[in-house]
């Protein structure tokens, strides 16, 4: 058996790999007015360009999975490395989704810093389809690199902030398993808009059929998959979630086997999180790291940007570059509302009607507002969470409405080629680093955009999705010149892993 106390374990906001053949007929995305969420929502098939990119990503995921499977023939002797391999195998395994068509890795590939790998989706829908192709999340994929280093969610009374957890809304607290990243890994498999399984037991059953079963049992014990599966398990696990209201655990297991399935599911998540914490993912190999170690130097523009980052622009207040005894993670793991506009490109706004399976992802339709951490802290939500929470946090909900976890800036510019589009912020509203810095600089300087204003992002900004608890002290009126904005972007680009210092 394994003790993970001293491991840095992590997992991503995982979603999924797509099956191109089924997408061409069924995958829809919302197209909305660029300035009015109240406008009529229509549906459209994904573009040929998006489908082509998806096929390329699928091919790469299959290649990586095949290489990982080959490593089963010559296992590393180190048990931590075995756990990392097991986690990688599950992360790239599309069989762990309801329609056997999505791997967690579909939204988290190395070439993009372990976030969304489809440029056309980042440019258009921002969020990614689930195993049920017509279902999209309300948020863009987070990077799972460096997520292992987030602490268990706790309240810091000195700064009046919640700190830690995983997910944009911090709901993977880490209070049950001792690690937020492992608990985060347990979310997507049974999320109806992600991997879509109706029961955690389905994930365990599917894993028991995979080539890595022997490795799993070697690490976690022979009892891991020693369950008496019902005859209809294949049929039950092929029905997309959510499960019927009267049968929240549709796989019929004995109490003993249900407990065993829960333990094994935890171990699956811990293994995935172990891979996310490995040096393959959480690397610290950027130019910034090389400068810290004396192996490289900033350019004049990068150095100026770093000074602005730590000074006039106040970026370092939340995206901390570390202090005594701290790793430079470029996040403080708190939450903030910077006033990001709603992203009308999200297909989630169109998911108000029952789909072909009767599921309604977004009853609020175009009136949906993402209230982030505040929604997580409501009493009803807290009581529904599998991870223990402090009920005293309910009173913190008003002060956390619309606040979103501060992401790391590491790898924000990592991309497979220069023209590749990345989506930024929790809803993917921004698609360039320059636009983000300009927003921080001018949010409260430029006027509000009028409907169909062609100057959006240049001469005006849309209203925030929610103005509750909006950060007004460090965002909105920074007084930066255009050249200073460019310098900050130049510095942030030094945070991309994979830098090779000149000899």
Predicted regions, residues:
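Bacterial N-terminal signal peptides that target proteins for export
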Residues: 4-24
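Bacterial N-terminal signal peptides
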Residues: 22-33
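Periplasmic c-type cytochrome electron-transfer domains
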Residues: 37-503
